[in-house]
Amino acid sequence: MATVGVKLGNIGSHWTTACRQAVSELNTLFRRKGITVTLALSGASPLISVRTDPAIAGTAVHGKTSAETDGAGKLLRADVRLPVKLTINTPQGIRDAGTGMAEVIAAHEFVHALGHEPHNTHLMAQTLNKMMGDRAAGDKLQAGAVAMPPLQLSDDSIEMLKGIWS
């Protein structure tokens, strides 16, 4: 089984928590679905470097990923950029979004880094809509009828990742 490192830069505690949760949940999902890659928070190569980028609006529900792959589509290195601050508009005004929302965004970008380029459905949808919880801990992102977390990959995404990492 291949291992890919995830190096968290100076991204603040909110993103650090979300990225750690994304790594853990993706590893569980990959294992359950037979995708033979594991994300590790230390010591592995190839490496996904994660940092925040003030150019990405906190109102957006996305990050930016650039990745270099070999001829077979396997990762050599990647750079994931996330918004510095993630916000949600509520009836009481704008507030910081919960860790669950940040986890979904981080996981989406990590899967892009692993070679999944297209946007389709579930975690890899092009459009993710904010779902405000009663409090920040309940915030989710929705792709069609699928609300996350927990993270979910479509059958197409699973097959694509299996093809890259088999």
Where are these regions (language model features)?
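Metzincin-family zinc-dependent endopeptidase catalytic domain
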Residues: 16-113, 117-120
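Fold-level signature of zinc-dependent metallopeptidase catalytic domains
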Residues: 1-21
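Metalloprotease/metallohydrolase-associated module, dominated by Zn2+-dependent proteases
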Residues: 76-93, 100-101, 117-166
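Intrinsically disordered, low-complexity regions
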Residues: 6, 10-13, 35, 44, ...
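Residue-level marker of intrinsically disordered, low-complexity segments enriched
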Residues: 2, 46-48, 156
